[in-house]
């Protein structure tokens, strides 16, 4: 029997989910997607593969998943049905019928994440997708974030243990400023668990004069054997785009 491979691009508000990856008895993006797909296709064991295993509370506007079906469904019709059945905080933005060899995780070449800071105190209408921290010197962050670029061993900026290789390449890291917000934009070949949030946490400490630029550079060069401790809040982090 021929299988058809579907690639989905989706957005989600991660506030009410325990991350992307399926976990026993917990509400996750993957479990919701699989349940909805099983229901509308009348299949029993559709397995979804995700390109990025975002943490609890982390958002996405460009997550990519893929799965296989034993039959063909027109893309436009499929997308409308999925979005109708999914909760309002998960939405499919694109469906593509793709080659059977495609794997969204293993073939991803790079990813872009944004971390969003508000310049003003948050209110009930905007608190979910950004972070407000008073008394921060963003000029220091603008200088420090450049140190991230290039190839580094990020073992001091992760909670993930026993990896064979902690080296990652950051192609671009910078701040974009608007009237209301600061966006920390990081584009890398791949990321390890909590890496961006630990990096942002250290940048927050630099901006509050609790850490120095020199300490940051030495940690990136592994000249200090002290792990980053401040994990930036999950709600400020957004997976923006995945490149193939």
Swiss-Prot record:
Q: Which family does it belong to?
A: Belongs to the tRNA pseudouridine synthase TruA family.
HAMAP family attached here?
TruA (MF_00171)
Summarizing the function annotation, the protein's role is: Formation of pseudouridine at positions 38, 39 and 40 in the anticodon stem and loop of transfer RNAs.
Molecular functions per Gene Ontology: RNA binding; tRNA pseudouridine(38-40) synthase activity
Q: Does the keyword Isomerase apply?
A: yes
Subunit structure of this entry? Homodimer.
Q: Which organism is it from?
A: Phytoplasma mali (strain AT)
Which residue positions are annotated as catalytic? 55
Cited Pfam families:
PseudoU_synth_1
The enzyme's E.C. designation: 5.4.99.12
Q: Which residues bind substrate?
A: 113
Q: Which reaction does it catalyse?
A: uridine(38/39/40) in tRNA = pseudouridine(38/39/40) in tRNA
Q: What is the lineage of its organism?
A: Bacteria, Bacillati, Mycoplasmatota, Mollicutes, Acholeplasmatales
Q: What protein name applies here?
A: tRNA pseudouridine synthase A
Q: Which NCBIfam families match?
A: hisT_truA (TIGR00071)
């Amino acid at each position: 029997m021929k299988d058809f491979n579907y690639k989905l691009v989706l957005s989600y508000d991660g506030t009410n989910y325990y991350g992307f990856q399926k976990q026993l008895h917990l509400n996750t993006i993957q479990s919701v997607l699989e349940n909805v797909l099983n229901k509308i296709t009348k299949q029993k064991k559709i397995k979804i593969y995700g390109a990025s295993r975002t943490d609890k509370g982390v958002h996405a506007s460009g997550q990519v998943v893929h799965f296989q079906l034993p039959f063909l469904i027109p893309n436009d019709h499929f997308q409308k049905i999925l979005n109708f059945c999914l909760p309002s905080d998960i939405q499919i933005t694109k469906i593509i019928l793709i080659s059977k060899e495609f794997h969204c995780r293993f073939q991803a070449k790079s990813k872009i994440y944004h971390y969003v800071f508000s310049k003003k105190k948050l209110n009930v209408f905007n608190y979910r997708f950004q972070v407000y921290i008073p008394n921060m010197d963003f000029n220091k962050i603008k200088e420090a974030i450049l140190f991230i670029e290039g190839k580094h061993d990020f073992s001091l900026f992760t909670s993930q243990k026993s990896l064979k290789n902690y080296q990652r390449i950051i192609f671009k890291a910078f701040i974009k400023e608007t009237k209301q917000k600061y966006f920390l934009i990081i584009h890398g070949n791949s990321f390890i668990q909590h890496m961006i949030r630990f990096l942002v946490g250290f940048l927050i400490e630099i901006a509050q004069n609790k850490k120095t630029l020199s300490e940051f550079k030495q940690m990136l060069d592994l000249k200090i054997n002290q792990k980053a401790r401040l994990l930036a809040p999950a709600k400020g982090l957004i997976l923006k785009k995945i490149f193939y």
